[in-house]
Amino acid sequence: MPALVLIGAQWGDEGKGKATDLLGGAVDYVVRYQGGNNAGHTVVIGAESYALHLIPSGMLRADCVPVIGNGVVIDPGVLLAEMDGLTARGIDVSRLLISANAHLIMPHHRALDRVIERYLGKARIGTTGRGIGPTYGDKVARTGIRVQDLLDPGIFHKKLELVLREKNQVLAKVYNRRRIELDEVVEEYADYAKRLQPHIADTGLILDRALRAGKVVLLEGSQGTLLDVDHGTYPFVTSSNPTAGYAATGAGIGPTRISRVIGIIKAYTTRVGAGPFPTELDDKVGEELRRIGGEFGVTTGRARRTGWFDAVIARYAVRVNGLTDLFLTKLDVLSGFDRVPICVGYDLGGERVDEMPMTQTEFHHAKPIYTDLPGWHEDISDVRSFADLPGAAKDYIRALEEFSGAPVSAVGVGPGRDQTLVINDLV
């Protein structure tokens, strides 16, 4: 059977956890392929709400194997705390598999992340301060420490000792911060190693065998397309590649295994942190979207910036990811608005453009060109079929399909597992 990719088509927080959980009932493995604990997703099952940061949403399905792939950077303390929290709520975490090739977030990564962000002042990126960027930086510089190094205390000690010679010089002499103590870190991570060892595996091999045996594998990205380090609004991006092209690499499987790429897209637009946002609403409407949609970060708690749907970035996401389907979320949040504008292009110095500007300078100056659609006032949270939606809501979905360039195959009308309309089967 083929692999499926689930990717955020905006700036993250699109509702990937809900989509993954829904699809989890039809898949055998759910693989997180990039990012770290700088992002979170929420899954609501009945009266229970689960906030996950590192563990794939597939953990909440008893017949699904959750996998943390080699493209992820892992803070073992955070991972174990998340595992313990799920265990306390009756979730069996023994199924979790962790790639031996994934990189570890170390104390010096967190320290450097925080101090560099403070040093940048007004030019700061808006990092979560969890060490994600410095960890990916060391991975590329070939000075990183991997999960497999936890299995060999001698190798772990040698690698860390060598790395800390440089990192402590930077912390102490450049930023006037306390040095990281080698022995303290070695002791801390030795405890992590004991607990994580049963979960460490050659996940690429396991996934390849599963696919050959006819199993269905879902590859789950974190963040979103516009936060991709290559294709996003650089430098206001994450340090990895959430886009679909990295899914195979970050999971350890071949790209020809992938047959479908599903883009998760919110019925309006949100963004956390700094960076350009053409449709942003700095008014009461924006505040209302934030309040009704509960737009506060799962990981940071920060209020998300809100705006109307931007079809230009949606078209861009369809293009760079090769999206075959869209999963539209939070349509219910728009109930009650008299009008629901869609940004269909940008005004750049008096000239209309319909595609993503080539440069970030242009994108910073892009002004949205809207087409207005009538809104609806009905509560749609209990609707379970497309045919039963209000006419204006159906027209809105059709317009999003037309302007985005991909079919909407599922629609979320609330946070619950069952609050979804399936238009086209995704698995």
Curated annotation (Swiss-Prot):
One cellular component term from this protein's GO annotations in UniProt: cytoplasm
Catalytic activity reported: IMP + L-aspartate + GTP = N(6)-(1,2-dicarboxyethyl)-AMP + GDP + phosphate + 2 H(+)
Positions that bind GTP: 12-18, 40-42, 304, 330-332, 412-414
CDD domains: AdSS
Cofactor note: Binds 1 Mg(2+) ion per subunit.
The entry's keywords: Cytoplasm, GTP-binding, Ligase, Magnesium, Metal-binding, Nucleotide-binding, Purine biosynthesis
Catalytic residues identified in the record: 13, 41
EC numbers, comma separated: 6.3.4.4
Residues that hold Mg(2+) according to the record: 13, 40
Keyword RNA-binding in record: no
Its biological purpose: Plays an important role in the de novo pathway of purine nucleotide biosynthesis. Catalyzes the first committed step in the biosynthesis of AMP from IMP.
NCBIfam families assigned to the protein according to its UniProt record, in alphabetical order: PRK01117.1 (NF002223), purA (TIGR00184)
Protein name (record): Adenylosuccinate synthetase
Lineage: Bacteria, Bacillati, Actinomycetota, Actinomycetes, Frankiales
Primary gene name: purA
